[in-house]
Amino acid sequence: LEAERGSLRETVIAPRLERALLKLNPWLSLDSAKKLVRDLTGLQASSLIESSEKVYNKLTRGVAIEQDGQPSRNVRFFDFDEPTRNDLVVTRQYSVKGVKKHIRPDIVVLVNGVPLVVLECKSPTLGEGWKLEAIDQFSRYQELDEKYRELGAPRLFETVQVLVASCGQAAVYGTVTTPHRYY
């Protein structure tokens, strides 16, 4: 997968998303698909939660575009009716470059090249502390606290919809910016 990314700062795998957009929207031109990917990955927002909400709306509702002077049509990023038509990749140790450090979540689930789920798998030797350690790691990755500034890669979490922390047979989940107590 790293070979398909322009750099480790890029979290969405653009070639996969472009292919999916063209497959799901056969009327779409390659130039329009490339522009949609740029628009999705280059969103301007004042906070992680704002960018996450903008991305969520685009991914779930689609985006209306006008192409070649034709009336507006809605572009789909995913096939919700036939999920098997989507490109699903589950990868481990998905490196993302932050300002000062790389982050490397244990498992990342990508659909059509878009990271949607991040999992942290903790050792049972941590005992009851596994949950706190995993959630703290998510907080650092997202830079949710001043003490984590420049130690994470919040761009990854603009598209991520679910965070899962697991240890053996136990698991908890949350969404972007979820406080510890709600996992």
Question: Across the structure, where does each feature detected by a protein language model lie?
Answer:
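An alpha-helical interface "stripe"
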Residues: L1-Y183
